[in-house]
């Protein structure tokens, strides 16, 4: 009987996410939970902790499967499999699930009549869709992608994709591609939120507070409407489906983060990718996608290189490697503010970054600190 563990945690809680989002925003850069500078710092805080969990698993449950939801899911899963050597790990995300719940309705079909093929990495993947006769339905989906209910998670501002671009690649991008394909529009919206009502993290902290108050009611029998404001829809569906497939050897088609093994030809076999896979008692068997178009191949290789640098920095505390990851990330502007954002985030998160201790002490000695009032208040109160 297989043993299965799930992980979903946030080192530093939402106060850490607030810093991740506010400090880059102060310098005109996108602050986002799993993308850009904020996403990299979430990885810096999280990867050492998942390593500690793996050490506990070696002692307590050495044959267990780890089903990881913890963001950034792809990088955490890669650290677990490649660097901590725990091969029985699958990374999950709700973004493909949300898309596959919404898109069949746009095509007037049931999900059972469609064949999905995903390729990419977590929060940076594309997909194609075929009907039961092998007809490519991707162009039809592209025409509907900007409609409400088109499969974009609730936490992503729905700036309109340029349809000509998507028809040229003939693939459907995930909602997070908006941060890359329409960077300026997404940045302007983020700055507007930053100035008016606080960052997404601050909004979610208020929602979390409201939910905890609601959950005090032992007579609660219905789903609170506040849950709809969060971006975690269908996580439970994905989790139960994956666990069922492993436990009962069901051979279910899912989109997961797993070892590439040739599924995407332009990436190394041991890279962790987010692809269509068959899940069974032996884990995830990735399904071949083949060659990506030239432009998307370039994007993907750059983003994978950025992830690898981020993971190495998280494991070693190498400041130069962290800066290299920053320079590679398209959402981090390469100008005089690049190192300012990196340095201020390091100091702001010192409590959760022991691997960077020496560099942080050096930065503090130079007087580096955030001037953002919300961040300063959090730090004054020990957060």
Spans of model-derived segments:
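Rossmann-fold NAD(P)-binding glycine/threonine-rich loop
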Residues: 15-83
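N-terminal Rossmann-like NAD(P) cofactor-binding module of classical short-chain dehydrogenase/reductase
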Residues: 2-9
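Active-site beta-alpha loop architecture of Rossmann-like, nucleotide-cofactor-dependent enzymes
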Residues: 12
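Rossmann-fold dinucleotide-binding core
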Residues: 65-133
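Soluble or luminal CAZymes and related metallo-dependent hydrolases
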Residues: 42-49, 95, 234, 302
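Long, compositionally biased stretches enriched for glycine and/or charged residues
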Residues: 105-383
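Local beta-strand N-terminus motif with an aromatic residue
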Residues: 1-2, 63
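Receiver (REC) domain switch-region micro-motif
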Residues: 5, 66, 283
């Amino acid at each position: 009987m297989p043993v299965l563990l799930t992980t979903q945690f946030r080192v530093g809680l939402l106060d850490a996410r607030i810093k991740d989002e506010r400090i880059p925003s102060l310098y005109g850069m996108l602050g986002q939970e799993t993308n850009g500078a904020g996403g990299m710092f979430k990885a810096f805080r999280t990867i050492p902790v998942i390593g500690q969990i793996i050490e506990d698993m070696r002692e307590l449950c050495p044959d267990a499967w780890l089903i990881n939801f913890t963001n950034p899911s792809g990088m955490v899963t890669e650290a677990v499999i490649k660097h901590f050597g725990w091969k029985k790990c699958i990374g999950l995300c709700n973004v493909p699930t949300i898309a596959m719940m919404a898109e069949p309705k746009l095509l007037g079909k049931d999900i059972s009549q469609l064949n999905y093929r995903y390729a990419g990495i977590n929060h940076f993947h594309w997909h194609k869709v075929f009907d039961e006769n092998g007809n490519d339905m991707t162009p039809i989906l592209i025409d509907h992608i900007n409609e409400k209910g088109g499969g974009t998670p609730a936490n992503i501002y729905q700036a309109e994709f340029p349809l000509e671009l998507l028809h040229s690649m003939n693939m459907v991008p995930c909602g997070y591609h908006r941060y890359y394909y329409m960077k300026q529009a997404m940045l302007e919206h983020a700055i507007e939120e930053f100035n008016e009502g606080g960052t997404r993290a601050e909004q979610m902290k208020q929602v979390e507070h409201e939910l905890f108050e609601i959950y005090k009611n032992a007579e609660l029998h219905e789903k609170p409407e506040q849950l709809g404001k969060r971006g975690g829809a269908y996580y439970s569906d994905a989790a139960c489906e994956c666990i069922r497939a492993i436990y009962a050897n069901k051979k279910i088609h899912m989109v997961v983060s797993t070892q590439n093994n040739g599924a995407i030809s332009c990436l190394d076999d041991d890279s962790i990718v987010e692809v269509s896979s068959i899940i069974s008692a032996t884990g995830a068997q990735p399904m071949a996608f083949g060659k990506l178009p030239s432009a998307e191949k370039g994007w993907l290789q750059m983003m994978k290189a950025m992830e690898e640098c981020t993971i190495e920095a998280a494991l070693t505390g190498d400041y130069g490697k962290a800066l290299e990851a920053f320079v590679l990330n398209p959402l981090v502007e390469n100008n005089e503010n690049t190192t300012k954002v990196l340095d201020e985030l390091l100091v702001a998160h010192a409590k959760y970054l022991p691997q960077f201790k020496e560099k942080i002490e050096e930065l503090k000695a130079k007087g580096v600190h955030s001037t953002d009032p919300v961040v300063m208040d959090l730090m004054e109160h020990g957060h």
